């Protein structure tokens, strides 16, 4: 990082022409910027993978909680899924389509459709919250099935 460089001890030879210094500086800037973006790209991909893993874990926990009658867990986990769904598009900034990812390029070519899928997932999760608050186990199972269908729909279009 630039903040770690000790520029006071950096000495340039008088033999270095201004053009050479300019080229060096330009190369240094390009390398620093490229490294920073590479790191940011890897971080956002890791973060979104963690979010989707948490989502999958919540789906399993919800299924078990419905069966056991633990409706508060259903509410908490479904609210978490809704919150995650609301933020999903922000985890797919331009340039995060390469690296260790299964995201298809269609996400960025059809970003409005991708955002609509995330919104539908949020709505399905909130519908499940409402069902859990009512205590209607049948409505919860239907809500979980609908939520799963929303997840699958997005995967079909946007994930390899």
Q: What do these predicted regions represent?
A:
Residues 2-27:
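Bacterial N-terminal signal peptides that target proteins for export
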Residues 36, 145-148:
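Processing junctions and N-termini across compartments
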Residues 23-27, 32-40:
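C-terminal segment of classical bacterial N-terminal signal peptides
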Residues 41-146:
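Extracytoplasmic c-type cytochrome modules immediately beyond a signal peptide or single-pass transmembrane anchor
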Residues 147-158:
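The canonical Cys-X-X-Cys-His
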């Amino acid at each position: 990082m630039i903040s770690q460089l000790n520029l006071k001890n950096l000495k340039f030879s008088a033999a270095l022409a201004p053009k050479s210094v300019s080229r060096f500086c330009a190369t240094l800037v390009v390398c620093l910027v490229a490294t920073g973006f590479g790191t940011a790209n890897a971080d956002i991909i890791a973060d979104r993978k963690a979010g989707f893993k948490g989502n999958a874990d919540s789906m399993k926990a919800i299924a078990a909680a419905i069966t056991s009658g633990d409706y508060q867990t259903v509410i908490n986990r479904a609210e978490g899924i809704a919150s995650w769904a609301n933020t999903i598009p922000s985890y797919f900034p331009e340039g995060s389509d390469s690296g260790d990812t299964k995201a298809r390029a269609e996400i960025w070519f059809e970003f409005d459709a991708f955002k609509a899928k995330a919104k539908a997932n949020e709505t399905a999760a909130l519908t499940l919250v409402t069902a859990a608050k009512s205590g209607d186990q049948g409505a919860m199972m239907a809500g979980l099935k609908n939520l799963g269908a929303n997840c699958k729909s997005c995967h079909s279009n946007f994930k390899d």
